Amino acid sequence: MQRSRAGADEAALLLAGLALRELEPGCGSPGRGRRGPRPGPGDEAAPALGRRGKGSGGPEAGADGLSRGERGPRRAAVPELSAQPAGSPRASLAGSDGGGGGGSARSSGISLGYDQRHGSPRSGRSDPRPGPGPPSVGSARSSVSSLGSRGSAGAYADFLPPGACPAPARSPEPAGPAPFPLPALPLPPGREGGPSAAERRLEALTRELERALEARTARDYFGICIKCGLGIYGAQQACQAMGSLYHTDCFTCDSCGRRLRGKAFYNVGEKVYCQEDFLYSGFQQTADKCSVCGHLIMEMILQALGKSYHPGCFRCSVCNECLDGVPFTVDVENNIYCVRDYHTVFAPKCASCARPILPAQGCETTIRVVSMDRDYHVACYHCEDCGLQLSGEEGRRCYPLAGHLLCRRCHLRRLQPGPLPSPTVHVTEL
């Protein structure tokens, strides 16, 4: 293919040089051009390059260094049509009817040449069969210039003599079939009908993902970091210490910058330190003392009631149970009790059974009955004679007499004259 194209280029340059040489001043027949060699039987038809035309001829330097001679008085013959694509940037002048009358053979020579910067849909190929003539110049790149070139009649319409108008352009002959059929590429669908189904599906998935991310963000929100003031999202980023929330990266040692999440730390002067920095930097001199044993608290510290304790020293004063993380209470003398022992010691005593009135199992509220300025269990509030359970209902109300709990019937019986009934004896198991 490259050899065929090079041969076509050489033939085109040779024909152009011959045409320009005939137009030089002093030529024997200035109005006639030499006929180029005929193409081979299998080659494509090449445009006639040795044309003659009218017009004033002046010396003009061309691309090949030749000067144009005076044009002959006779009109050049109409060149043969070239079977070249009309849309090529270097299409042949054979597609114009006025190529021989108003054109210039000089401009034809200028337009010849092979330009490697532009591609051509068809390339000049030599017939593998031997022929008498040179290779055919069938490439659109090696043909003469198109209508917009310097040699066309339309390009020199302003320089034509008065009354002369260029002949109308003639449509080129239909080109033959391309040697290499081009595949038909499917064009993308138009946008007149809106987005495609795939685009709508992608948009729906994007909205669904955004909603899922918003729901997850709202679910994993813990609060505001007290140090940086930003929101805390995710359990791995949250840290709670000293009654406040921190980011894991914000709750660090003020000395070495180590993260303190899940580690022992010490709060000294509103600054937190890890255990190593606290022990080996002299801060232990300002460490708190335990309110129970009086020793320095060098490890975990438990603060309650405005005092500091070792976790092992914070115990109930009755049962000696460790109260670290367990509900507790204190008396007026700041003695520490668990809830059970506190009610045992300080709960009111029942006037009937003399036992403390304690809350029920799993309940923190104490229920008691107060009658005649005395406290009773609910189960102990009954008639002392017949054992009827007393309450505020009609027929079960209490009618006390001489400090005894009586129902109405037993109360009236005791008011009748006669010997008083023997008091009821209640046996209580200890």
UniProtKB/Swiss-Prot annotation:
One Gene Ontology cellular component annotation held by this UniProt entry: P-body
Keyword entries, A-Z: Cell junction, Cilium biogenesis/degradation, Cytoplasm, LIM domain, Metal-binding, Nucleus, Repeat, Repressor, RNA-mediated gene silencing, Transcription, Transcription regulation, Zinc
Region of interest called Disordered, as start-end residue ranges on this chain: 22-149, 164-198
CDD domains to which the protein is assigned, alphabetical: LIM1_Ajuba_like, LIM2_Ajuba_like, LIM3_Ajuba_like
Annotated SUPFAM superfamilies: Glucocorticoid receptor-like (DNA-binding domain)
Residue span(s) of domain LIM zinc-binding: 223-284, 288-348, 349-417
Pfam families, alphabetized: LIM
UniProt-listed SMART domains: LIM
Signal peptide as annotated in the record: none
Gene Ontology biological-process annotations: cell projection organization; cytoskeleton organization; miRNA-mediated gene silencing by inhibition of translation; miRNA-mediated post-transcriptional gene silencing; negative regulation of hippo signaling; regulation of cell morphogenesis; regulation of DNA-templated transcription; response to hypoxia
Compartment(s) where it occurs, according to its Swiss-Prot or TrEMBL record: Cell junction, Adherens junction; Nucleus; Cytoplasm, P-body
Family per record: Belongs to the zyxin/ajuba family.
Complexes and interactors: Forms homodimers. Interacts with CD2AP and WT1. Interacts (via LIM domains) with SNAI1 (via SNAG domain), SNAI2/SLUG (via SNAG domain) and SCRT1 (via SNAG domain). Interacts with EIF4E, AGO1, AGO2, DCP2, DDX6, LATS1, LATS2, SAV1, EGLN2/PHD1 and EGLN3/PHD3. Interacts (via LIM domains) with isoform 1 and isoform 3 of VHL. Interacts with ROR2. Following treatment with bacterial lipopolysaccharide (LPS), forms a complex with MAPK8IP3 and dynein intermediate chain. Interacts with PRICKLE3.
PANTHER family: LIM DOMAIN-CONTAINING PROTEIN JUB, WILMS TUMOR PROTEIN 1-INTERACTING PROTEIN
Main function: Adapter or scaffold protein which participates in the assembly of numerous protein complexes and is involved in several cellular processes such as cell fate determination, cytoskeletal organization, repression of gene transcription, cell-cell adhesion, cell differentiation, proliferation and migration. Positively regulates microRNA (miRNA)-mediated gene silencing. Negatively regulates Hippo signaling pathway and antagonizes phosphorylation of YAP1. Acts as a transcriptional corepressor for SNAI1 and SNAI2/SLUG-dependent repression of E-cadherin transcription.
Protein name: Wilms tumor protein 1-interacting protein
Name of the gene: WTIP
